[in-house]
Amino acid sequence: MANRTVKDANSVHGTNPQYLVEKIIRTRIYESKYWKEECFGLTAELVVDKAMELKFVGGVYGGNVKPTPFLCLTLKMLQIQPEKDIIVEFIKNEDFKYVRLLGAMYMRLTGTSVDCYKYLEPLYNDYRKIKSQNRNGEFELMHVDEFIDELLHAERMCDIILPRLQKRQVLEEAELLDPRISALEEDLDEVETSEEEDDEDEKPERMQSPEPHRRSYRDMDRPRRSPSPRYRRSRSPRRRSRSPKRRSPSPRRERDRDRHRSKSPRRHRSRSRERRHRSKSPGHHRSHRHRSHSKSPESRSKKSHKRSRRGNE
């Protein structure tokens, strides 16, 4: 029969390789049109041609649970069990991304934990877009690195239960695997080296540029005192020019000043002269007292003249 596994096939994980796919899905694949027409009589060499014709990945879809061509070819490879070198060439093929994914799927189902990490982790650097068909028959956009990440960490992929994998940390401690080096780490190292070179180029420029004047610790620690209003210094001519102009006196004040000046200008002058004369003369205080208490002879003669006139009348 066409659905039997080849005679010289080895058991995988202690069972028939075709039994890695669930029985319900396996029977749906056997009944599908693609399996009967395209997968009949395929060998390891002819599978490559069919893999190059793939346009999307996926498991089963629709209400009738129809399998995708990707799932049919996966079961066919489990049936014929190609050699490991052929699968490695599938994975290393960079021209056809769906051929690469088909080889990665087969390696994940049949390979050991060490082989899965060794051959699938380099595909993390493949960021090409792929189409994936979901259960409703709708297409979704994915990337190759996303598909590989799900293969290594998910429990189910393309409606197939994936075998258990040992943790990478355990394999590293057993020295079966080397620590993984990410492509991002290499890019970061290149960026750091370029930044260090730029810093070294900038250092001589900084040494040549003069340093700005620094204040002494006294200037920094001592708080600045604002000048007291009582002993302020006179403003410089620049500050005077910048200071706001004084307000012009009101017209009422000007009138009061004019009245005060116009009252007795001669009187003010005579008083100022008398004060200067008194300050110069030594007997100023005595003469002032004498004048205030004693009457002058002229005033006496005037009074006697008035009395004589009254007597004659």
Swiss-Prot record:
Report the protein name in the record. Pre-mRNA-splicing factor 38A
What segments bear the compositional bias annotation Basic residues? 225-250, 260-294, 302-313
Q: Where is the composition biased (Basic and acidic residues)?
A: 203-224
Q: Quaternary form? A: Component of the spliceosome B complex.
Coiled coil regions, renumbered to chain? 172-201
Q: Family, per the entry?
A: Belongs to the PRP38 family.
* Keyword Coiled coil assigned: yes
Record's compositionally biased regions (Acidic residues): 184-202
Tell me a GO biological process for this protein. mRNA splicing, via spliceosome
What would be one Gene Ontology cellular-component term for the protein? nucleus
